Amino acid sequence: QIGSKTVSSLRKTDIKRFYNYLADERHLKPATIDNIHTVLHQILDMAVDDDYIRNNPSNNVLKELKQSHCFQTEKRRALTKPEQELFLDYLKNSPTSKYWYPVFAVMIGTGLRVGEVTGLRWCDIDLEEGIIDVNHTLVYYDHRTEGSKRGCYFNVNTTKTPAGRRKVPMLGFVKEAFLMEKERQELLDLHCEATVDGYTDFIFINRFGQPQHQATLNKAIRRIIRDCNDEQLLKDENAEVLL
């Protein structure tokens, strides 16, 4: 498979063969292959940025796989406005979960991808003008296949496309979320201790001063939704749960 190849020797046919193997022999679900593609595509984008390859060989491969296998795309339902308000209100007032309010408020209020939010630095936001400068993504993946002994660690993926580099306006509650996070870190004397590819001073950090990553946020949101649903059900047996 592709693990034995160098990045410069990878071709689109190699990626196609790998995805077909995952679907036909490993019988992985489309959503799982989609997740693998997300990571692989970002890694190869970084290889393009570093001039190891000229083009990303994974471009459009997932789309072609879905068409050839007649995969049904799983429709993801966005939270309704009442659900968003319920979710954020619960976070803001929960003694055990309010720590997560700022990062999820920013996600909901901006529509940014997880890696774009976790990659935000204080210099990327203008609180006075209410503008967020989105210019890179924070990526966390396993480097051991590249010969590194360090295993999983972060990289910054800069994008050259207009869609990837953009200015996003802050809603009022998004600005409030940034200020809450700033105040919390000042109160706890927390500082970013990480430097990733020359980038530092990340906004959303854990208690060790390291950037948050997707796996941690996924676990947190599942726990929050479970607790939020339980609390609503206790208040009203006929209440509809969040998800």
Which role fits each region the language model picked out?
Residues 1-50, 95-98, 211-217, 236-243:
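N-terminal core-binding DNA-recognition domain of tyrosine site-specific recombinases/integrases
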Residues 45-54, 180-183:
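Arg/Lys-rich amphipathic alpha helix in sigma70-family domain 2
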Residues 17, 38, 42, 89, ...:
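Generic recognition of well-ordered alpha-helical segments
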Residues 89-100, 110, 168, 184-194, ...:
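Short, basic (Lys/Arg/His-rich) helix/loop patches that form interaction surfaces
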Residues 30, 34-38, 49, 53-55, ...:
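Basic, Lys/Arg- and aromatic-enriched nucleic-acid-binding interface segment
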Residues 60-66, 83, 119-194, 198-199:
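Conserved tyrosine-mediated DNA breakage-rejoining catalytic core shared by Y-recombinases
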